[in-house]
Curated annotation (Swiss-Prot):
Residues 49-68 bind DNA. This is Transcriptional regulator AcuR. Pfam families: TetR_C_13, TetR_N. PROSITE patterns: HTH_TETR_2. Residues 1-25 are annotated as: Disordered. A transcriptional repressor for its operon. Probably binds to 2 operator sequences in the promoter. Induction: Strongly induced by acrylate, the operon product (20-fold), and dimethylsulfoniopropionate, the operon substrate (DMSP, 10-fold). Part of the acuR-acuI-dddL operon.
């Protein structure tokens, strides 16, 4: 899922005293997080340096090391910030009581496509991007990324349980397995859409997943 709004900042963890000439502390922290998310959702972790983030955020180097020990520490903070941002995005779609459960899932995929379209399909999902780079990333990233994905899967599984309860989804489905399959496929569709700079892979995935629902519920 791409970055579509200004993400919330993670809790600040200052390391040293505020550097001279630094902007307001909270603004500097938010600027660093936002610049980091924008660059990493588009370019990935390995190809983006700290200096590039500092330039985009327009903060001095001292401000970066006031909050983060190093680039790896910054990367973990970005995962945390993205997780918080994404939880709110899922709330917006999954908690919409005016829609049936599966319609809420379709709302989420439409919101995701609209977010990618706003950036010309050049920004992808931070979690998916980092997962692709995991072989070159610090080991701490693995547990953080898996934890985020498992949270998304649990929330989606609950949505499928609601769909079963109202007769919208066949009871033959295992909600947990179906949620895992959804996120494996959706992350792949996001990656392909970013590669091709077009929404077609997203449409292909949602059509296929939707047909699976319809076929099973009509049996």
């Amino acid at each position: 899922m791409p970055l579509t709004d200004t993400p919330p900042s993670v809790p600040q963890k200052p390391r040293r005293g505020r550097p001279r000439g630094a902007p307001d502390a909270s603004l500097a922290h938010q600027s660093l997080i936002r610049a980091g998310l924008e660059h990493l959702t588009e370019k990935g972790y390995s190809s983006v340096g700290v200096d590039e983030i500092l330039k985009a955020a327009r903060v001095p180097k001292g401000s970066f090391y006031h909050y983060f020990r190093n680039k790896a520490d910054f990367g973990l903070a970005l995962i945390e910030a993205y997780d918080t941002y994404f939880a709110r995005l899922l709330d917006q779609a999954f908690l919409d009581g005016s829609l049936a459960p599966l319609a809420r899932l379709r709302l989420f995929t439409r919101m995701a496509e609209e977010g990618m379209a706003r950036h010309g399909f050049r920004r992808g999902c931070l979690v998916g991007n980092l997962g692709q780079e995991m072989g070159a990333l610090p080991d701490d990233f693995r547990a953080a990324l898996i934890g985020v994905l498992e949270t998304w899967q649990r929330r989606t599984a609950q949505l499928f349980r609601e769909a079963q309860a109202c007769g919208e989804l066949s009871a033959d489905h295992d909600p947990d397995a179906l949620a895992e399959a959804f996120w494996i496929g959706w992350e792949g569709a996001i990656l392909r859409a970013k590669l091709e700079l077009r929404p077609d892979p997203l449409h292909s995935f949602t059509r296929t997943f939707g047909r699976h629902f319809v076929t099973r519920t009509q049996e």
